[in-house]
Amino acid sequence: MPDIGTDLVEVIEILVKIGDQVKKDDSLITVEGQKASIEIPASHTGTIKNIIVHIGEKITTGSLIAILNGIDDNVKSKNDSSSYSFKNSKNTSTNSNLGNVNNNINNRTILVHATPTVRRLARKFDIKLENITGTGRKGRILKEDVISYKNISLFNDIKKSLKKTNVNYYKDNVTCDDFKSIELTRTQIRSSKNLLKSWLTIPHVTQFDESDITELENFRQKYNSDLKDKSKKLTILIFVIKAVSKALEMFPKFNGRLINKDNRIAIVLNEHINIGIVVDTDDGLLVPVINRVNKKNISSISNDLRIISERARSRKLNFSDIKEYGSFTISNLGGIGGTNFTPIIKYPELAILGISRALIKPYWNSHAFIPKLMLPLSLSYDHRAIDGVAAVRFITFVKKMLTDIRFLMI
């Protein structure tokens, strides 16, 4: 047995049962001494015939743990020549002592501090505890350490697979009479690669909801009708951008990104609220960014949106329009149509909000049906960092801002 600083150790977990097939080096039991816990492996492959020890029992070097069947005669003969007994037990045996605690325990066994619950979780994920750096007291491995290690492993596996993955397109022998060829633009090719990366690396979930924008629309129509410069008209999107900036201040996790930091998965929050807006151009979709949206009023946001949209469509985007990575993206299809859709998150962001066409719907106010203008909202989010409860709270907050635009003035 490896030196764990004591002659006697306590059995705290039995990892097998009678009839189990075990291989050499599979863990049989977990024992705990004064300094650490350790899993004791089988010295041979076979079937568990009998388990000798029980939880809470004190054992020492040479104690018989279990009896295995299905071992070749040479192994049996070798083991039968030595009789092992464990302390504080009335049982003795000269059977194949293949599960004995002995000084020749596999060199790969390393002392680790971990509870049985953590060890079971590590076995479930097929993770070796000796590969994990514990963050608990005196280096104890916690449940969070195992989960973090698993997430990092998945993260690295995905990164490796992405390096080997190309955008696959259909290949076949066709004639020009059968098909018409339309080549993708450089923007569309670049976009397709980014979309593939997002779809493969981010577990998407989409939360659908509707916001009552009846009062907002009444105000917007009145404001626009009084404008002398009609190029400065306000759109519904302007108010949504402002509402989202408020929500990002209230729920900063949506304004971050996932990173692998010091071998741990972490959410890094962006210092500024920079919202990307999907713009449809002849070359494909572009996502210029409005920086520091939370510091701007409705008129400033409207002016910035008009400028970057015109630059995107005329292929005159400045480096300043895209140099700061967006922290959140909004995709607006309301001017085209549709009721709901599932927008794909822009990697490495954590969420994206989709807007569809507003429709008048009947609303029951306890006395009668009244018409309400309802704006469909589709919030896609990264389920690794954001759970469903947080997503509902976020979209509910956005709805509140849009239903009563006085909140946007605060």
Swiss-Prot record:
Residues where N6-lipoyllysine is found: 35
Segments of this protein annotated with the region Disordered: 81-100
Enzyme category, top tier: transferase
Domain of life: Bacteria
Cofactor: (R)-lipoate
Record note on cofactor: Binds 1 lipoyl cofactor covalently.
Biological process according to GO: pyruvate decarboxylation to acetyl-CoA
Domain Lipoyl-binding per the UniProt entry, residue ranges: 1-69
One GO MF term attached to the UniProt entry: dihydrolipoyllysine-residue acetyltransferase activity
Catalytic center residues: 383
Catalytic reaction equation(s): N(6)-[(R)-dihydrolipoyl]-L-lysyl-[protein] + acetyl-CoA = N(6)-[(R)-S(8)-acetyldihydrolipoyl]-L-lysyl-[protein] + CoA
Record domain Peripheral subunit-binding (PSBD): where: 113-150
PROSITE patterns hit by this protein: BIOTINYL_LIPOYL (PS50968), LIPOYL (PS00189), PSBD (PS51826)
Family: Belongs to the 2-oxoacid dehydrogenase family.
The protein's name in its UniProt record: Dihydrolipoyllysine-residue acetyltransferase component of pyruvate dehydrogenase complex
Organism, scientific name: Buchnera aphidicola subsp. Baizongia pistaciae (strain Bp)
Classification lineage: Bacteria, Pseudomonadati, Pseudomonadota, Gammaproteobacteria, Enterobacterales
